[in-house]
């Protein structure tokens, strides 16, 4: 997910995206804990995408 794509979204869409990413992160962590996760790089990607969305939400809030 590119930052430019995220910048085009509104606050509600970003909140929805954040919720989806956090759910995905939780599922990946559970798979990793149970030894079922084959693609460990996905954890890093999701973590960084969460950070991107949170950064944009902060920017849009004007804080």
From Swiss-Prot:
Pfam families: Ribosomal_L29 (PF00831). One of its GO terms (biological process) is translation. CDD domains: Ribosomal_L29_HIP (cd00427). It comes from the Bacteria. Keywords: Ribonucleoprotein, Ribosomal protein. GO terms for cellular component: cytosolic large ribosomal subunit. PANTHER family: 60S RIBOSOMAL PROTEIN L35/50S RIBOSOMAL PROTEIN L29, LARGE RIBOSOMAL SUBUNIT PROTEIN UL29C. This is Large ribosomal subunit protein uL29. It comes from Buchnera aphidicola subsp. Acyrthosiphon kondoi. The gene is rpmC.
């Amino acid at each position: 997910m590119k930052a430019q794509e995220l910048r085009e979204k509104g606050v509600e869409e970003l909140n929805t995206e954040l919720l989806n990413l956090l759910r995905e992160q939780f599922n990946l962590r559970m798979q990793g804990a149970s030894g079922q996760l084959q693609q460990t790089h996905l954890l890093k990607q999701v973590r960084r995408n969460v950070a991107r969305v949170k950064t944009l939400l902060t920017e849009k809030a004007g804080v």
